[in-house]
Curated annotation (Swiss-Prot):
Protein name: Aspartate 1-decarboxylase
Modified sites of kind Pyruvic acid (Ser): S24
Keyword Transit peptide assigned: no
PTM text: Is synthesized initially as an inactive proenzyme, which is activated by self-cleavage at a specific serine bond to produce a beta-subunit with a hydroxyl group at its C-terminus and an alpha-subunit with a pyruvoyl group at its N-terminus.
Coiled-coil stretches noted in the UniProt entry, renumbered to this chain: none
Protein species of origin: Agrobacterium fabrum (strain C58 / ATCC 33970)
Amino acid sequence: MIRIVRAELHGITVTGADLDYHGSITLDPEHCDLAGIRPLEFVDIWNKQSGARISTYVIFGEAGSKCCILNGAAARTCQRGDQVIICSSSYVEETALYDTAPMVLTFTPKNDVKDVLRYRVKETARRPFDFFIETLPRAENSDVDDGSAADRAIA
C-alpha cells in the first residue's frame, strides 16, 4: 500500500485563527464538497508562508462563507492572510493508482475557486506510472472574476 493525495485545497487563504476553540480546521462545506473532503476527515496542512506542517481534522463552517479557520493548537501555526495547502490522503495498492483521480482546487486571494484540476496516473511508453493534470471546467456558480465580464462591459 502507498499513501496518495485524495483531495487538495491549494493556496486557500486563512481567514481566521481561534486558539480557544477545540482543535480542527473550519472550512466552507461548498469547497469541501467540490474537492471531496468530508467532515471529521484528517488532513495535512502546509503553510506556504512559514513552512509549518500540521495535521488536524475538518469541521464544516457556514456554506458560502469561504472560511478557512485554524482552531485550537493549529491556530498557532497560521495567521490570517497566510496561504495554505490542505491535503487529504488515502492508502491504495500501487495498481489502484490508475483508478484514482484526486480533485485539486486552487484559489484566488479571496478564496474563490480559481481552477478545478484532476490528477491522473496512466501507463505510457515512457514509464509504467506517468503523471498528468487535467483542467476541468469551473462550476457555474463560481464567483471568480477573471476580468472577462469587465472586458465585455467595456466593449
